[in-house]
């Protein structure tokens, strides 16, 4: 099987479901909470969560009474999220590429990309698709990283990796440079016909494990 950026990304996240849910989801959940509160999403709305992971935004939207469809490239993430969405019969998670959504135009009242858009090989395609599937007057919440290596801990890890004798050809940590600045994000959304209501920088705490269990599989 030929390896593509999508399959590499899926394999990466398939291998870290437990660690992601424990250590990464609390940060994503805080950002998702802020994004949801800045919209009018409520019971009965149809919400799309793009790059949903283990459900940081999906679970909060479901608790509001929204009908949520969550998508992710990682089949393991999707399986975990479907387990967690079981109490919400109107909600489900699907394996799908956010750069090529299979939904009709104007399907959703709101769509969210929390820390996922900049992971796409073609973030512009992902943004195009998110805009396409939201109805006129609906909500689109985009939460990119505000620095090129993501959370502060990733900066520390990146520096540490550079000091290790890694095998030839080992990939570098991805640079999450797309949509970092408020100006760039606003311009990208306005170019796609969106009325931008707010663009803010948010600092949120990131929970870290103790050193003895920091890296595990």
Where are these regions (language model features)?
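A short SAM/SAH-binding and catalytic strip from SAM-dependent methyltransferases
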Residues: 110-124, 146
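A short glycine-rich, Lys/Arg-flanked "PGG" loop and its adjoining helix->strand segment in the class I
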Residues: 124-139
